[in-house]
Amino acid sequence: MGRFDGRTAIVTGAAQGIGEVYAKRLAGEGANVVVADLNAELGEQVAKQIVADGGSAIFQRVDVADGASAQALADATIEKFGGIDHLVNNAAIYGGMKIDSLLTVDWDYYRRFMSVNMDGALQVCRAVVPHMRAKGGSIVNQSSTAAWTYSNYYGLAKAGINSLTQQLATELGWSNIRINAIAPGPIDTEATRTSTPQAIVAQIVQRIPLQRMGTPEDLAGLCLFLLSDEASWISGQIYNVDGGQVYRS
Protein backbone atom coordinates (compact mmCIF):
# COMPACT_ATOMS: atom_id res chain seq x y z
CA MET A 1 0.00 0.00 0.00
CA GLY A 2 1.30 3.44 -0.94
CA ARG A 3 0.57 6.70 0.81
CA PHE A 4 -1.14 8.02 -2.31
CA ASP A 5 -3.12 5.00 -3.49
CA GLY A 6 -6.24 6.13 -5.33
CA ARG A 7 -5.27 9.79 -5.23
CA THR A 8 -4.40 12.15 -8.05
CA ALA A 9 -1.48 14.58 -8.09
CA ILE A 10 -0.54 17.28 -10.58
CA VAL A 11 3.14 18.20 -10.83
CA THR A 12 4.04 21.21 -12.95
CA GLY A 13 7.51 21.51 -14.42
CA ALA A 14 7.66 17.71 -14.34
CA ALA A 15 9.37 17.03 -17.67
CA GLN A 16 12.83 16.93 -16.13
CA GLY A 17 14.91 17.66 -13.05
CA ILE A 18 13.27 18.09 -9.67
CA GLY A 19 9.71 17.91 -11.01
CA GLU A 20 10.42 14.65 -12.81
CA VAL A 21 11.67 13.08 -9.58
CA TYR A 22 8.60 14.33 -7.70
CA ALA A 23 6.29 12.86 -10.33
CA LYS A 24 8.00 9.48 -10.36
CA ARG A 25 8.12 9.25 -6.58
CA LEU A 26 4.42 10.06 -6.31
CA ALA A 27 3.57 7.44 -8.91
CA GLY A 28 5.75 4.95 -7.07
CA GLU A 29 3.60 5.47 -3.98
CA GLY A 30 0.35 4.88 -5.81
CA ALA A 31 -0.74 8.28 -7.11
CA ASN A 32 -2.29 8.95 -10.47
CA VAL A 33 0.15 11.58 -11.74
CA VAL A 34 -0.41 14.36 -14.23
CA VAL A 35 2.97 15.29 -15.68
CA ALA A 36 2.47 18.95 -16.60
CA ASP A 37 5.04 20.94 -18.54
CA LEU A 38 5.55 23.27 -21.48
CA ASN A 39 8.00 20.78 -23.02
CA ALA A 40 5.76 18.17 -24.60
CA GLU A 41 8.54 15.92 -25.87
CA LEU A 42 10.22 15.43 -22.51
CA GLY A 43 6.95 15.46 -20.59
CA GLU A 44 5.49 12.67 -22.69
CA GLN A 45 8.62 10.63 -22.07
CA VAL A 46 8.28 11.00 -18.31
CA ALA A 47 4.61 9.98 -18.35
CA LYS A 48 5.35 6.97 -20.57
CA GLN A 49 8.20 5.89 -18.30
CA ILE A 50 5.92 6.03 -15.26
CA VAL A 51 3.37 3.84 -17.04
CA ALA A 52 6.09 1.45 -18.21
CA ASP A 53 7.20 1.11 -14.59
CA GLY A 54 3.68 0.12 -13.55
CA GLY A 55 2.38 3.52 -12.50
CA SER A 56 -0.53 5.67 -13.61
CA ALA A 57 0.24 8.91 -15.46
CA ILE A 58 -0.74 11.20 -18.28
CA PHE A 59 1.00 14.20 -19.79
CA GLN A 60 -0.70 17.57 -20.14
CA ARG A 61 1.04 20.50 -21.80
CA VAL A 62 0.68 23.68 -19.77
CA ASP A 63 1.90 27.24 -19.76
CA VAL A 64 1.39 28.12 -16.11
CA ALA A 65 1.49 31.83 -16.90
CA ASP A 66 -1.69 31.48 -18.95
CA GLY A 67 -4.94 31.16 -17.07
CA ALA A 68 -6.71 29.29 -19.87
CA SER A 69 -3.86 26.79 -20.08
CA ALA A 70 -3.96 26.26 -16.31
CA GLN A 71 -7.71 25.69 -16.49
CA ALA A 72 -7.22 23.18 -19.30
CA LEU A 73 -4.78 21.32 -17.04
CA ALA A 74 -7.36 21.06 -14.28
CA ASP A 75 -10.09 20.05 -16.73
CA ALA A 76 -7.95 17.31 -18.31
CA THR A 77 -7.11 15.94 -14.87
CA ILE A 78 -10.76 15.77 -13.84
CA GLU A 79 -11.74 14.17 -17.14
CA LYS A 80 -9.11 11.45 -16.79
CA PHE A 81 -9.02 10.76 -13.05
CA GLY A 82 -12.21 12.31 -11.63
CA GLY A 83 -10.59 14.48 -8.96
CA ILE A 84 -7.52 16.37 -7.78
CA ASP A 85 -6.02 15.65 -4.37
CA HIS A 86 -2.50 17.07 -4.57
CA LEU A 87 -0.67 19.81 -6.47
CA VAL A 88 3.02 20.58 -6.76
CA ASN A 89 3.75 24.01 -8.26
CA ASN A 90 7.27 23.37 -9.51
CA ALA A 91 7.34 25.05 -12.93
CA ALA A 92 9.91 27.84 -13.28
CA ILE A 93 12.33 29.54 -15.61
CA TYR A 94 15.77 30.38 -14.31
CA GLY A 95 18.16 33.28 -14.43
CA GLY A 96 17.59 36.96 -13.82
CA MET A 97 19.68 40.10 -13.74
CA LYS A 98 20.54 41.90 -10.54
CA ILE A 99 17.92 43.95 -8.75
CA ASP A 100 19.89 47.15 -9.34
CA SER A 101 19.12 46.80 -13.06
CA LEU A 102 15.34 46.73 -12.59
CA LEU A 103 15.00 50.37 -13.60
CA THR A 104 16.41 49.61 -17.04
CA VAL A 105 15.22 46.04 -17.56
CA ASP A 106 13.42 44.93 -20.70
CA TRP A 107 9.89 45.01 -19.36
CA ASP A 108 8.53 42.23 -21.57
CA TYR A 109 11.29 39.89 -20.35
CA TYR A 110 10.66 40.86 -16.75
CA ARG A 111 6.91 40.27 -16.99
CA ARG A 112 7.34 36.86 -18.63
CA PHE A 113 9.84 35.87 -15.97
CA MET A 114 7.55 36.90 -13.12
CA SER A 115 4.41 35.53 -14.75
CA VAL A 116 5.93 32.05 -14.75
CA ASN A 117 7.93 32.08 -11.52
CA MET A 118 5.44 33.84 -9.27
CA ASP A 119 2.07 34.29 -10.95
CA GLY A 120 2.11 30.76 -12.41
CA ALA A 121 1.59 29.12 -9.03
CA LEU A 122 -1.46 31.29 -8.38
CA GLN A 123 -2.86 30.63 -11.86
CA VAL A 124 -2.70 26.88 -11.31
CA CYS A 125 -4.12 27.18 -7.79
CA ARG A 126 -7.05 29.19 -9.15
CA ALA A 127 -7.82 26.37 -11.57
CA VAL A 128 -7.24 23.45 -9.19
CA VAL A 129 -8.50 24.59 -5.77
CA PRO A 130 -12.23 24.56 -6.69
CA HIS A 131 -11.85 20.80 -7.25
CA MET A 132 -10.28 20.35 -3.81
CA ARG A 133 -12.77 22.27 -1.71
CA ALA A 134 -15.28 19.45 -1.26
CA LYS A 135 -12.89 16.94 0.32
CA GLY A 136 -9.67 18.87 0.99
CA GLY A 137 -6.23 18.52 -0.50
CA SER A 138 -2.61 19.53 -0.22
CA ILE A 139 -0.30 21.77 -2.21
CA VAL A 140 3.46 22.21 -2.25
CA ASN A 141 4.98 25.29 -3.86
CA GLN A 142 8.59 25.27 -4.99
CA SER A 143 10.39 28.28 -3.55
CA SER A 144 14.14 28.83 -3.20
CA THR A 145 16.67 30.10 -0.69
CA ALA A 146 17.29 32.74 -3.37
CA ALA A 147 14.32 34.53 -1.80
CA TRP A 148 16.67 35.45 1.07
CA THR A 149 20.18 35.23 -0.34
CA TYR A 150 20.29 36.60 -3.90
CA SER A 151 19.23 39.92 -5.39
CA ASN A 152 17.79 38.95 -8.76
CA TYR A 153 14.45 38.41 -10.42
CA TYR A 154 14.47 34.79 -9.35
CA GLY A 155 14.82 35.71 -5.69
CA LEU A 156 12.15 38.37 -6.04
CA ALA A 157 9.74 35.84 -7.55
CA LYS A 158 10.46 33.22 -4.91
CA ALA A 159 9.92 35.73 -2.11
CA GLY A 160 6.50 36.20 -3.68
CA ILE A 161 5.94 32.44 -3.61
CA ASN A 162 6.68 32.40 0.12
CA SER A 163 4.12 35.10 0.78
CA LEU A 164 1.59 33.45 -1.53
CA THR A 165 2.02 30.18 0.35
CA GLN A 166 1.29 31.77 3.71
CA GLN A 167 -1.61 33.86 2.45
CA LEU A 168 -3.29 30.88 0.81
CA ALA A 169 -2.68 28.67 3.84
CA THR A 170 -4.79 31.05 5.89
CA GLU A 171 -7.50 31.31 3.26
CA LEU A 172 -7.70 27.65 2.23
CA GLY A 173 -7.30 26.03 5.62
CA TRP A 174 -11.02 26.50 6.24
CA SER A 175 -11.60 24.10 3.34
CA ASN A 176 -9.08 21.58 4.72
CA ILE A 177 -6.60 22.45 2.00
CA ARG A 178 -3.02 22.64 3.21
CA ILE A 179 -0.25 24.50 1.42
CA ASN A 180 3.47 24.60 2.19
CA ALA A 181 6.64 25.52 0.33
CA ILE A 182 10.06 23.96 -0.13
CA ALA A 183 12.98 26.37 -0.53
CA PRO A 184 15.95 24.46 -1.96
CA GLY A 185 19.51 25.65 -2.00
CA PRO A 186 21.88 24.66 -4.84
CA ILE A 187 20.62 21.44 -6.43
CA ASP A 188 22.62 19.17 -8.74
CA THR A 189 20.48 18.70 -11.85
CA GLU A 190 21.25 18.32 -15.53
CA ALA A 191 20.41 22.01 -16.01
CA THR A 192 22.89 22.98 -13.29
CA ARG A 193 25.63 20.79 -14.73
CA THR A 194 25.26 22.22 -18.22
CA SER A 195 24.95 25.87 -17.20
CA THR A 196 27.36 26.26 -14.28
CA PRO A 197 31.15 26.00 -14.69
CA GLN A 198 32.80 23.49 -12.37
CA ALA A 199 34.87 26.24 -10.77
CA ILE A 200 31.68 28.02 -9.74
CA VAL A 201 30.17 24.77 -8.45
CA ALA A 202 33.27 24.27 -6.30
CA GLN A 203 32.85 27.76 -4.84
CA ILE A 204 29.20 27.07 -4.08
CA VAL A 205 30.01 23.80 -2.33
CA GLN A 206 32.60 25.56 -0.15
CA ARG A 207 29.80 27.70 1.30
CA ILE A 208 27.61 24.71 2.19
CA PRO A 209 28.24 23.28 5.68
CA LEU A 210 27.30 19.77 4.52
CA GLN A 211 29.89 20.12 1.72
CA ARG A 212 27.87 19.00 -1.28
CA MET A 213 25.16 20.11 -3.65
CA GLY A 214 21.70 18.82 -2.95
CA THR A 215 19.91 16.38 -5.24
CA PRO A 216 16.28 16.18 -6.34
CA GLU A 217 15.97 13.09 -4.15
CA ASP A 218 16.94 15.22 -1.14
CA LEU A 219 13.81 17.27 -1.79
CA ALA A 220 11.42 14.52 -2.83
CA GLY A 221 11.05 12.93 0.60
CA LEU A 222 9.99 16.23 2.13
CA CYS A 223 7.66 17.01 -0.76
CA LEU A 224 5.83 13.70 -0.43
CA PHE A 225 5.66 14.04 3.34
CA LEU A 226 4.08 17.50 3.07
CA LEU A 227 1.55 16.24 0.54
CA SER A 228 0.67 13.19 2.62
CA ASP A 229 -1.70 12.70 5.55
CA GLU A 230 1.34 12.45 7.81
CA ALA A 231 1.54 16.25 7.56
CA SER A 232 -2.17 16.79 8.19
CA TRP A 233 -1.58 19.62 10.71
CA ILE A 234 1.19 21.40 8.83
CA SER A 235 0.32 24.36 6.64
CA GLY A 236 1.76 27.75 5.74
CA GLN A 237 5.37 26.71 6.33
CA ILE A 238 8.49 27.39 4.26
CA TYR A 239 11.13 24.67 4.51
CA ASN A 240 14.75 25.47 3.68
CA VAL A 241 16.57 22.45 2.23
CA ASP A 242 20.07 23.73 1.62
CA GLY A 243 22.66 21.88 3.69
CA GLY A 244 22.68 24.77 6.17
CA GLN A 245 23.87 27.32 3.60
CA VAL A 246 21.26 30.04 4.07
CA TYR A 247 22.40 30.70 7.62
CA ARG A 248 25.92 31.47 6.42
CA SER A 249 24.92 33.95 3.73
Regions found by a protein language model. Name each.
Residues 181, 202-230, 234, 241-243:
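C-terminal helical subdomain
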Residues 98-102, 106-111, 204:
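Substrate-binding pocket helix/loop in short-chain dehydrogenase/reductase
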Residues 125, 157-160, 165:
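Active-site helix of classical SDR
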Residues 2-34:
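Canonical Rossmann dinucleotide-binding motif of NAD(H)/NADP(H)-dependent dehydrogenases/reductases
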Residues 130, 170-175, 232:
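Alpha-helical segment proximal to the catalytic Tyr-Lys
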Residues 40-41, 61-73, 107, 217-218:
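The beta1-alpha1 cofactor-binding region of Rossmann-like NAD(H)/NADP(H)-dependent oxidoreductases
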